[in-house]
Amino acid sequence: GPMMNFLFAIFVFGLITQLGEETRAPIVAEVEAKSAAENMGLRAGDRLLSVNGIAIESYEDFQKLLNKNRDQNIDVVIEAEDKVRKNLKLAVSSLKNPNIFSSEEFIGTIEGLSSVAKSAVVGVISGSAAYKLGFRTGDEITQINSDKIDRWTKVEEKFNSWIAQAKSLENQKIRITVLRDSTADLKDKSKIDIEVTADQFAKFQTMSDVGFDKPDLYLEQVVKGSPAEQADLQKFDKIVSIGSVKIEKWEQVLNNIKSFNGKEPLAVEIIREGVVLVKKITPQVTSQMTALGQEDKRYTIGILPMVTFAAPEMVKLKAPSLWTSIAKGTSRTIDISTMTVFSFVKLFQGEVSHKNIGGMISIGKAAKDSFEMGIQSFLMTMGILSVSLFILNLLPIPVLDGGHLFFYIIEVVRGSPLSVKKMEVAQQIGFVLLMGLMVLALFNDFTKFFFKT
């Protein structure tokens, strides 16, 4: 039983590598200004070719090598967007692993290097030059002349170039294509072309001078019925301060709300269409599931920032031989088995909510959703489910295969089997435990999909 589940997972994961697995390309997504990563020579768009002489095929390969070389210097060969190759020496530091299901307590990281890139959505200051040219908060810049734009850093590069060369470019026309919300329910977007000339940027020094803002502090959504809605916060409002704290990053918004003392309402200063307003908001305690399955109870006011991330560049990797597929399939099966064991341990320790236990409805929905995403996602889901069944069957619960193994171990230790009566009692206890687990899974499915809790 369990061994067939294990072997099936190896087969499925190996099949994925034979068909060709789509994974993130080894490309630097974003580099924070004035960070260690920038000072060491990394730039957004750089392609990572090798680390300490080891070739890199995917970003996952790069992350594994960072993990292996924590608190050390590494030699990295990169290819910049202009196709020029460079040799860089990078300092790798340690970071506490955010994945609580991993066996590794720390991972390798480079300060200022981001694995995701913000999309080219802009905030626009009311009454600014950018506003007068026709740009609006929430516009997503998708193209500048014939160049496709897929991330914020490309927008910065283009505008800074125009500002620096405004006089020499004179009246050169520039066509900027944006996507903008076009309906009342904000589900559809219209494509708009805005034409400008380079010399219109001659008197400015930075993008901020033109009137463009990073979108981080603008609101994308105000949750219905939330304290924010009751205080009349609206989409595209920009948060300026909370109490006496001037807000520069979204993390400050979260931290100030989470640290609410439960007494006086928070004074939230916002800018709406150029007008400064102060709203009194009393946060409320909400419970929500994190991406890692932990139940997080904290103060919230019901707002989401206008931050979206660009789709990463993908690369399709195919195993060169059958033996490589088997090796990779086995390695991934072992990795996921380890994570599954850790998830069970965290569940019993109470670090992961029991609400994550799902039954047939959850399994069916996962299979359906993954199938709609493509054959690779579907096969990956089947492999993960097979590993879960493998681990579940090995739990030392009578009725399951793991329970039988547990009895055999007892027999070896004692030198004789348990009595029939003790076996019957153990089987009954195991049956009750298994039924309880099934009822809990079914209950979670119904509350999640039918009662939306």
Predicted regions and their residues:
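Interdomain regulatory linker/hinge segments that flank or connect interaction modules
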Residues: 2-9, 51-103, 144-203, 270-274
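Short helix-capping/hinge motifs at transmembrane helix termini and TM-loop junctions
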Residues: 12, 16-21, 349-350, 372, ...
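Short extracytoplasmic/periplasmic juxtamembrane "stem" segments immediately C-terminal to an N-terminal membrane anchor
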Residues: 27-49
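Short, conserved catalytic or interaction motifs in soluble domains
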Residues: 53, 146, 244, 402, ...
